[in-house]
Structures are given as structure tokens and as C-alpha cells.
């Protein structure tokens, strides 16, 4: 009766869709079946944290993902919040329960050899557009900046004497990114071609043929078009080049803290995922090369 009254509450008072109500009911039913199988009975008013933990383990053993398990726990939390409000229970058995952590997918990136081949073999075309498009790909790879940071770059943000770019990241936080001689040459070339081809233009560093600032979809599609030449890539966005920058830096012995600053991450935990990515690559090489792997 308690489960039915909870589902009716969701259905008639919260106006949840029938599909959602049935999903809540199925989640509670799964716990009920587990309790009956393990202990021969199920009483919602007597459920304790130990039972919930055992159920979580059984779900993970059966191949449920962390996301699925956490969704089921969310259903149970709603059920016991309802029972607390109704005065049926005095303690929530899930109060000390923490669901399994979702595994973050490793970032998609290009190997250095793949990146070199892409840049060496791609014909970006002649004139202003070809010069600009090549520089965009090169700058993403050389600096690791975000798409929004690249299109937000103004002429005044480029300091050639110090070889520094001033970029504005998330929450308007500014940081300085150094650049090398190869990128500097490409930038000089682009500026000369740009200024001659489009004398009247905005203050933006990267511009369209009409002189206006680039927009996100234009740059996204440009990057996607060029990354499509790498058959092994599943994702083909500007962020792949950001991932490639970070992974390349770490593979060449850059300090994790330095890479964090260059990427503009607030927490080093965010940057650590690239260290995991490089480690996964090492494991792959080991398995392919070692006779005992």
C-alpha cells in the first residue's frame, strides 16, 4: 500500500508522466525482489542502509552502469522522503548512502604524428581564407585555448614582443598563454594578408571576409572539416585540439600544474584526466609491444 500511495502521489499530485511513474515503481520493485531473495521478506519501513549497499553491489555485479544505479537510488530517495513527510518512517535509510561515481570518459586526442601529418598534408588554400584557416588549426593546437577564447581574441591581446596571448576564459578570467616562433611567423603572415585584403575591419584578431568577428559555428565547422581527414577520430570538435595540446604537453614531460594554468582550469583535478589519457596510451603500447603483455 505504501508503494502504491507513493506512485499515486507522483501521478496525481506531482503530475509525473505515466512513463516516469512506472520507472519509479520498477526501481522500488527491484529492491523489493532483491530483499525477498536475500532475506525472504521486504518491508519498506524496516529497510536499513546495509540492505541498500548490498543491493548497489548486486546491481554493479550485474553490469548496471553508475548512471543507472544512481538513477535507481534517486527513485528510492524520493520514496523515503515521501514516507518521512507522511510520518511513516523517522529515519531515511539512504541518508548515509553514496552512489557509485560516474566514470568520466577519457578525452579524445590526436597523437603527435597524426597532428603533424594533418598540418603537413592539408591544403588550406591560398589567400586570406586559407591563411586564416591554417592559423586557426595551428593556434588551437599550439595554445590549447577554447573556441570561445579564440574567437574573442582581439588585436590588442597579442603581444609579439613578449610572445604572449591574453585570453579571456570562463567567468571572464584572464590568463596569459605563451607562443613559439613557428606560430608567430604564421600570425605575422596572416596579419599581413588580412590587413591588405580587408583594410576595414573590426578589432577582432580573427575575422570573416566582411571584416566582422568570426562566430562559433563557422570555426566549429572549419575544424570538423579538417579533423574529418583523420579516420580514427570519433569526435571532431575544437575541443579535440585542446585535448591534443594538453596530452602532447604531458607526453613531453610538462608539469601538470603548468598545463593546468595554460588551460585555465580552476582545479587540477580537471587537468588530471589528461594524465590518465597518457597513461592509457602507455598501457596500449605496452600490450602491443611486450611479449608477456
PLM regions and their residue ranges:
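Conserved catalytic core of the tyrosine transesterase superfamily
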Residues: 1-293
Amino acid at each position: 500500500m505504501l508503494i502504491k500511495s507513493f506512485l499515486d502521489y507522483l501521478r496525481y499530485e506531482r503530475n509525473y508522466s505515466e512513463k516516469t511513474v512506472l520507472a519509479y515503481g520498477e526501481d522500488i520493485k527491484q529492491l523489493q525482489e532483491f530483499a525477498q531473495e536475500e532475506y525472504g521478506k521486504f518491508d519498506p519501513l524496516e529497510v536499513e542502509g546495509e540492505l541498500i549497499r548490498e543491493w548497489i553491489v548486486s546491481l554493479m555485479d550485474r553490469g548496471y552502469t553508475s548512471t543507472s544505479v544512481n538513477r535507481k537510488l534517486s527513485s528510492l530517495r524520493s520514496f523515503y522522503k515521501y514516507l518521512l513527510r507522511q510520518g511513516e518512517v523517522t529515519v531515511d535509510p539512504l541518508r548515509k548512502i553514496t552512489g557509485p561515481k560516474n566514470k568520466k570518459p577519457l578525452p579524445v586526442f590526436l597523437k603527435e604524428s597524426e597532428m603533424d601529418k594533418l598540418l603537413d598534408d592539408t591544403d588550406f588554400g591560398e589567400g586570406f581564407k586559407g591563411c586564416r584557416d591554417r592559423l586557426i588549426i595551428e593556434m588551437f593546437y599550439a595554445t590549447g585555448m577554447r573556441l570561445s577564447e579564440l574567437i574573442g581574441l582581439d588585436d590588442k591581446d597579442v603581444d609579439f614582443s613578449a610572445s604572449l596571448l591574453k585570453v579571456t576564459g570562463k567567468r571572464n578570467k584572464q590568463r596569459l598563454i605563451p607562443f613559439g616562433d613557428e606560430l608567430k611567423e604564421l600570425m605575422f603572415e596572416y596579419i599581413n594578408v588580412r590587413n591588405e585584403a580587408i583594410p576595414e575591419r573590426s578589432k577582432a584578431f580573427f575575422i570573416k571576409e566582411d571584416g566582422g568577428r568570426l562566430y562559433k559555428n563557422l570555426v566549429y565547422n572549419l575544424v570538423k572539416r579538417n579533423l574529418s581527414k583523420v579516420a580514427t577520430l570519433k569526435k571532431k570538435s575544437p575541443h579535440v585540439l585542446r585535448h591534443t595540446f594538453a596530452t602532447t604537453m604531458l607526453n613531453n614531460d610538462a608539469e601538470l600544474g603548468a598545463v593546468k594554468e595554460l588551460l585555465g582550469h580552476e582545479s587540477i583535478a580537471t587537468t588530471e584526466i589528461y594524465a590518465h589519457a597518457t597513461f592509457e596510451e602507455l598501457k596500449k603500447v605496452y600490450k602491443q609491444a611486450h611479449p608477456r603483455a
